[in-house]
Amino acid sequence: MASMLPPVMLTLPEAQEEFHDLLRKLRDPHNQRKLIDWIKYNWREDDEESPEGILRSIATDIRLHLPIEAVLPSEKIIVPTSGENSDCDPKYTRHVDSFLYDNELLHELTAKGVIESHYCVQCGSTKTKSLTFISHSASRAQIAYMYNVLLPPLDDDKVLLDVGSRLGPILYGAYLYTNVGKIYGIEINGELCRMQREIVMKYGFQDRIEIIDSSIEKRTDLLATADIIVLNNVFEFFMEPNEQIKMWKLIYERVKKKALLVTCPALDVTMESLPDNGIDMDKWVQELDVYNMDAPDMPTDDPELKMIHLYEVINPGKTD
């Protein structure tokens, strides 16, 4: 019976030399670059020092300082009157932050009764309906999808801006998953800015992340210079429709050509809920396909992930 040979174990220099040999065999520099990108996107570590592990740790830290709904008294929530979230009756809607409470933890807390999940349709009866859960943050799964699947590689000469960064998960994800050189989070709530800065300092992110306590109206320079702008549920629950239109017009006019916009929900969904907004979507942006369809263990058909869309600005807008 033939004996099984033990696997060949390489030293680091030997592995590096074999890798260089493999790249040389590809010859085409474009394919060499694609292989390097493929390795970067598809290599996964699952420990406390991995991006996933660090984001879990950050979420644990933040949960200690916030109520479950992760909405501060200093924040004013405005229930949408149009669009797909106009049915969010405050009596039957609960704000549960998806970054802080993933589906597994949410299920555990609802099972224990810590978070209610149903309401009584008729008092004294057994008729119940499910409550609606709303989050104002991207989940950790959405963050991983955004940087590992949706976007192309972000190099150190690029600038990323998160408008309305709140707890900062988009910023921390950009730091951990990409090489993007500068990461700005602009947030109008001073308490949230302080919390973000504490996380940035604790985890040593201050070399690339900067938190700006201001409104985007006062810092249009950031819109004009950013290469990637993230707009995650940014205005809908915090502004009246006329103010939302004002903000979107500002973005429409100030972002530069070829800038990438990451939005949740899709831009057309947002614009449909804001009629007479003066924005010509067809001339302004084109939607881009997912960059890395080969990412492992990443269910790109997941409805939660499909809510996130990527656009390239093809013609900076001008409104009347």
Tell what function each PLM region has.
Residues 168-180:
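Conserved SAM-binding loop of SAM-dependent methyltransferases across substrates and taxa
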Residues 188-320:
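Domain-level detector for long C-terminal conserved domains
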Residues 156-166:
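Conserved class I S-adenosyl-L-methionine
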Residues 158, 181, 227:
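Conserved acidic residues
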Residues 148-156:
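Glycine-rich helix-loop-beta junction characteristic of Rossmann-like nucleotide cofactor-binding loops
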Residues 182-187:
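Conserved SAM-binding motif I beta-strand of class I
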